Amino acid sequence: MFVDQVKVYVKGGDGGNGMVAFRREKYVPKGGPAGGDGGNGGDVVFEVDEGLRTLMDFRYQRHFKAIRGEHGMSKNQHGRNADDMVVKVPPGTVVTDDDTKQVIADLTEHGQRAVIAKGGRGGRGNTRFATPANPAPQLSEHGEPGKERYIVLELKVLADVGLVGFPSVGKSTLLSVVSSAKPKIADYHFTTLVPNLGMVETDDGRSFVMADLPGLIEGAHEGVGLGHQFLRHIERTRVIVHVIDMSAMEGRDPYEDYVTINQELSEYNLRLTERPQIIVANKMDMPEAAENLKAFKEKLQDDHPVFPISAVTREGLRDLLFEVANQLETTPEFPLYDEEELAENRVMYTMEDEEIPFNITRDPDGAFVLSGDSLERLFKMTDFSRDESVKRFARQMRGMGVDEALRERGAKDGDIIRLLEFEFEFID
């Protein structure tokens, strides 16, 4: 089964907890703190594997969680950093954040990697908190939670040339006679439901990859006829071969077909119209095809060349393939996303994001509810079983301006404050 879009959940590994420990050794009085730091959590990394052709594997596993770092130990022993979780994806995979709709990565080359969910930093042990005023601190940090998000994987096939046109105009037949591909061919619409790739070689030794894409109909850019699923695969092609049925046996006018398909391409993505387009008049072996071709050329406003062929009798294929190869030699690749745009999005998803420190809302019962990534991460990294850690958390909240913001919202002594699943009282 060909799967080209799937939604999955990814989570980086949590950092290991720091440790509270002291050096207890003979002849070493007042040995001081000796708690080690926790190890860093593993990242969720996507890597391109050219042996994969579909996102089928993601239908059966949709949750990917990297392992957490090892906890710190006594004698200042640092916890072991966790290994990254490497997930293989096929070339042509675009990774998008499901919430923000921002593109995280466009993976096209074999071995290319991208960090999709970063692991958390390991918590610090009590050795890190020693000061002249407090040489034996009784506090440490929990590990930082790993980044978690839902993402959408979208496969856009890698092909140099894309065959487009209405259903049943002969695209699959054309691919089958110019390459070794074996697409399903039948006399009904939407026989082709998934892209078929074939390697084409011309008589002079030039080669390229051609994709037989499912047929388009009017309204495809709005999703009609599964249009969105079909059009996404055209985006990477460098040359578009527009196949038109000149026999007009289905009652459609060839020129109207030509106009309709080009309108769908421009409505879906304006950059599709920038690609060279080769017009192919197929089924020239059928009656009235020659007359229809003459009328078609008269309606074309420009001197755009038209290649008359018959995929069944193989008439005109040599000239067509030479023209395709010539166009590929002079046509650069069309990146789906600018490098600057991708770089900006990658920066957006690092763990050092500029985030709103906190938000304050009210529950119906009058309690104040605190939220925000920075504050919640700080809360999760605090060890509330130790008094010094609790006092440090209170100082950090005060430094972030939480206390002052609560007073401005009308908080008074004894009011209930909620943060995640915990409650505590406000003390002014």
UniProtKB/Swiss-Prot annotation:
UniProt xrefs under Pfam families: DUF1967 (PF09269), GTP1_OBG (PF01018), MMR_HSR1 (PF01926)
Region (Disordered): 117-143
Any one Gene Ontology cellular component term annotated for this protein: cytoplasm
Keyword list, A-Z: Cytoplasm, GTP-binding, Hydrolase, Magnesium, Metal-binding, Nucleotide-binding
Gene Ontology MF: a single term: magnesium ion binding
Protein function: An essential GTPase which binds GTP, GDP and possibly (p)ppGpp with moderate affinity, with high nucleotide exchange rates and a fairly low GTP hydrolysis rate. Plays a role in control of the cell cycle, stress response, ribosome biogenesis and in those bacteria that undergo differentiation, in morphogenesis control.
Family: Belongs to the TRAFAC class OBG-HflX-like GTPase superfamily. OBG GTPase family.
Protein name: GTPase Obg
Gene (UniProt): obg
